[in-house]
From Swiss-Prot:
Name of the featured protein: Mitotic spindle checkpoint protein MAD2
Functional note: Required for the execution of the mitotic checkpoint which monitors the process of kinetochore-spindle attachment and delays the onset of anaphase when this process is not complete. It inhibits the activity of the anaphase promoting complex by sequestering CDC20 until all chromosomes are aligned at the metaphase plate.
Family, similarity comment: Belongs to the MAD2 family.
Tissue expression notes: Expressed in actively dividing tissues, early in organ development, in young leaves, lateral root primordia and root meristems.
């Protein structure tokens, strides 16, 4: 008698999906800050996450910022109010925007409105996240070297009716003129779909002028 093997599916709730996506952004942001040398190598500690060696910053002020950010992102995701999160890397000296790491989020509104759940294997979600993290780790191969001291900021694009904490302020989009863009892998919890794109300043245009 032939037997059938079904792929294991895990129940994904709105709360669980929000936790997955907000945690992903925290680890992705730390990896970007490390791989783009925004902070020195010795500022990070190695941990294991998503079946990969990952790096987390030990600077207390940045850790606190990331913790508050993760909590706020999770809250907005559960409310279905978050459209995208952008990590911006800027020149410390001039404030010029050098890179924008854009995480666009699509939400299954039926889950938000009706409280239903979805099904997807945790392992499948992890594999999709692994692919993104590997691309971030190899960013030195496709992004220009940041040969100056840089700082970062995080922008959140939300629905207009969302309550914004006093710790957040309205900002310009911090765009880059004539950017080069690289589309990275995305992942999907079946409730939140995340697409990733990095845009960067193209110095070659300046050299040709």
């Amino acid at each position: 008698m032939a037997s059938k093997t079904a792929a294991a599916k895990d129940i994904i709730t709105l709360h669980g999906s929000a936790a997955i996506v907000s945690e992903f952004f925290c680890y992705a942001a730390n990896s970007i800050l490390y791989n783009r040398a925004v902070y020195p190598e010795e500022s990070f500690v190695k941990v294991k996450k998503y079946g990969l060696p990952m790096l987390l910053i030990e600077d207390e002020s940045v850790k606190s910022f990331m913790s508050n950010l993760t909590s706020q992102i999770s809250e907005w995701l559960e409310a279905g109010k978050l459209q995208r999160v952008v990590l911006v890397i800027m020149s410390k000296a001039t404030g010029e925007v050098l890179e924008r790491w854009n995480f666009r989020i699509e939400t299954d509104n039926e889950v938000v409105d009706k409280g239903v759940s979805r099904e997807k294997s945790d392992k499948e979600i992890m594999r999709e996240i692994q692919a993104i993290m590997r691309q971030v780790a190899s960013s030195v191969t496709y992004l220009p070297c940041l040969d100056e001291t840089c700082v970062f900021d995080v922008l959140a694009y939300t629905d207009t009716d969302v309550a914004v904490p006093f710790t957040w302020i309205e900002s310009d989009p911090k765009l880059i003129a004539n950017p080069q863009m690289v589309k990275l892998h995305g992942f999907d919890t079946k409730i939140h779909k995340v697409d990733t794109l990095v845009s960067y300043k193209n110095d070659e245009w300046d050299e040709e002028e």
